Design a protein with these regions (language model features):
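N-terminal cap/leader regions of alpha/beta-hydrolase-fold enzymes
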Residues: 1-271
Length: 271
């Protein structure tokens, strides 16, 4: 049965907007045509054995450190892509670089505006076509997903759609529960993920979903027993892409999370 409540994305106390000031190493590419077209930031060798799709948080494909994290995956030998998929209407009020939320958007104060906008980005009729274009256009033998916040929802659907070709997914401060906004059952979505999954929730992420006994953690383990989870209690939702790295805990845990995601992705794409 689909969830009847209307879940949000980022819990109270989450990291806010962070401008992207990183000197990128990559380029841009497009996959698909028409409504299914996906513009991407790409980094690394397109002929790599495994491509990693890094699905962004709600500030979209040029949010904070997202492209820097993609470059880190490219440096490890993956073909890394950050898709522009929160782009209905060019993003909310123009978004950030035409995608996602606009700079400085007040998530807490404008929740109704956020909810109205995010409902325009369902899987059925929008993300399914984008995922299809990515899977068809990427040459790599294997594909992995890495999601941040809302991106956790995207990579869960990527895994469900991609079958055995998708070797793993990982999600930092995940918001898979946003599935409920679109009338989906988030637990059922997680159970449909057959590949190993890694969840890295923050200290303020919903423990009923993402704690040691969390329902979505359990559902992902039902899908694949090799799935794993680690809570980061000292940081808040959004820390990897948007957290203040002048804070020692944020800097430390961003690096730890990146290393865990790199190692997990590498391990499960090797076979």
């Amino acid at each position: 049965m689909a969830e009847t409540s209307e879940p949000s994305c980022c819990p109270a106390g989450s990291a806010g907007y962070l401008a992207a000031d990183y000197a990128t190493a990559g380029a841009f590419a497009s996959f698909g045509e028409g409504a299914a077209k996906v513009d991407c930031y790409v980094s690394g060798d397109a002929a790599a054995r495994c491509a990693v799709i890094l699905a962004p948080d709600v500030w979209g494909w040029n949010s904070g450190r997202t492209r820097a994290l993609a470059d880190a995956f490219a440096a490890r030998g993956f073909f890394a892509l950050v898709p522009k998929v929160l782009d209905v209407g060019g993003g909310l009020e123009g978004g950030t670089d035409g995608d996602g939320l606009p700079p400085g958007f007040d998530m807490a104060g404008r929740r109704a505006d956020f909810m109205e906008w995010i409902k325009k980005h369902p899987h059925a009729g929008h993300l399914d076509a984008k995922i299809g274009s990515l899977l068809a256009g990427i040459a790599a033998e294997k594909v992995a997903g890495v999601g941040f916040c809302w991106g956790g929802y995207f990579v869960a659907h990527l895994a469900a759609a991609g079958g055995a070709r998708v070797s793993s997914i990982a999600s930092a401060h995940p918001s898979i529960q946003i599935a409920g906004v679109h009338g989906e059952d988030a637990a059922a979505l997680c159970r449909a993920v057959a590949c190993p999954s890694l969840l890295l929730p923050a200290g303020n992420d919903d423990k009923a979903l993402y704690g040691e006994e969390g329902s979505l953690v359990a559902a992902l383990k039902e899908g694949n027993a090799a799935s794993a989870m680690r809570v980061f209690p000292d940081v808040t939702h959004g820390w990897t892409t948007r957290g203040d790295i002048t804070d020692a805990a944020v800097a430390r845990d961003t690096q730890i999370a990146l290393d865990l995601m790199l190692d997990f992705t590498e391990k499960h794409s090797a076979g």
